Amino acid sequence: MKIIILLGLIGASSSAPLISQRLLSASNSHELLLNLNNGQLLPLQFQGAFNSWIPPFPGFLQQQQAQVSGRPQFTLSTLESFAGLFPNQIPLSRQVGLAQGGQAGQPDLSQQQTPPQTQQSASPMSYVVPVKVPQDQTQMFQYYPVYMLLPWEQPQTVTSSPQHTGQQLFEEQIPFYNQFGFAPPQAEPGVPGGQQHLAFDSFVGTAPETPGMPVEGSLLYPQKEPISFKHDNAGVFMPTTSPKPSTDNFFTSGIDPTIAPEQKVKTDSLREP
């Protein structure tokens, strides 16, 4: 255990920076962030006990410092004025001239693009391109519509069709699938007393006739003969017109007259009581 602790102390002491080294970052961004006051590269200095151990950086950084010193220097106030500008703000006295030009409606573009030569030496801010929009343009694009009527949403004038009477009106009211027997019963205007005519007579089993009304003694459409779909032994109960319908032959539509009376007695005796 003592040997492990001793080896750890030796490794920690050997890794200490006891020899002067040249510490340089991959780019000069860190040095620029630390030295924005005078705008030039300065050697990186530690704050603490390592200042007495590491001497000032010689050699390469001093050459870079000598090269940078020949360039024009910018103070911190100039950099702050650059950073504080917004796109819709115009510096110095150019804002007053632009406001007057916007009110007149015809701003002088030549004066905006080419500032006077006296201001170039006074301040470098005169090269900022102004983006202030004149008032006549702001009034044009000041409001935007919230809802726009599309071409297919515009109100259209509906022309009312002339009133039809008789057979033509009845044909317009009946849909195209009425001839197949799927439409609900509708009242014919030609039937007196407001009687309703079913599209398909399920009890009788006859196809509906083509409706036709006499016009001056002639038929508009020729009448078709009713087609009977009823079979002889269809097994359908047909109600009679008598007040007390008979329920003897409920499951059979009729009695075969060829059956002998003896066979009829046998079949009646086989029925359940």
UniProtKB/Swiss-Prot annotation:
What are the record's GO terms for cellular component? Answer: cell periphery; cytoplasm; cytosol; extracellular region; extracellular space; mitotic spindle; nucleoplasm; nucleus
Keyword line = Biomineralization, Cytoplasm, Glycoprotein, Nucleus, Secreted, Signal
Please state the protein's primary subcellular location: secreted
The domain of life is Eukaryota
Location of the region described as Interaction with ARHGEF5 in the Swiss-Prot/TrEMBL record: 125-127
Q: Which family does it belong to?
A: Belongs to the ODAM family.
User: What is the protein name given in its UniProt record?
Assistant: Odontogenic ameloblast-associated protein
- Species source reads Mus musculus
Q: Coding gene?
A: Odam
